[in-house]
Regions:
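N-terminal, polar/charged subdomain of small-to-medium soluble alpha/beta proteins
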Residues: 1-90, 95-136
C-alpha cells in the first residue's frame, strides 16, 4: 500500500497491509495536523502534490526495503487536499524481523519521504492569513 490520496488515512490499515508471520515487529508513524506552528494558531492545512509524488513514494519505499534485509513490508501514504486539525497527513508502517530494525527503518522512511516527496502545504491561520510551505 503506497499512495497519494485525498481519502482519510488510517494507521491500522497500513499496519495490516505489512503484517506477516515472519515479522516480529510492525512499527508505524502518523504525522497529524497540529493546531499551531511557530506560535501561530493553525485552523487547517491544504496539501498539493506534483504528479510524480506517488512514484517518489514507491522509490523511497523500495530503497528502504533494499537497504535492510530485515524489512518484510512497507506501507506509506500521504494525503492531499484540505485537512483539519487532527487529520493524518502522512502514515507509514514497516514490518521487520525485529523491533530495533523496525524503528530504524520507519524513521528512515519518514525522514526520506519528508525530504523528497514533492508536496506543498498551505497553512491557514486563525487570524485569516496563510502561507505556503515547501514551495520551490
Amino acid at each position: 500500500m503506497i499512495s497519494v490520496t485525498e481519502e482519510p488515512l488510517e494507521v491500522a490499515t497500513h499496519e495490516r497491509a505489512v503484517a506477516q508471520p515472519g515479522a516480529g515487529a510492525v512499527v508505524s508513524f502518523a504525522g497529524v495536523v497540529r493546531d499551531h506552528d511557530h506560535g501561530r494558531t493553525v485552523t487547517l492545512l491544504e496539501y498539493e502534490a506534483h504528479p510524480s509524488a506517488e512514484a517518489v513514494l514507491k522509490e523511497v519505499a523500495a530503497e528502504i526495503a533494499a537497504s535492510d534485509p530485515e524489512v518484510r513490508g512497507i506501507a506509506v501514504s500521504h494525503r492531499v487536499g484540505v485537512l483539519q486539525i487532527g487529520d493524518a497527513a502522512l502514515v507509514a508502517a514497516v514490518a521487520t524481523a525485529h523491533r530495533t530494525a523496525g524503528f530504524a527503518a520507519c524513521a528512515r522512511l519518514v525522514d526520506e519521504v519528508k525530504a523528497r516527496l514533492p508536496v506543498w502545504k498551505r497553512q491557514v491561520f486563525a487570524d485569516g492569513t496563510e502561507e505556503w510551505v515547501n514551495c520551490p
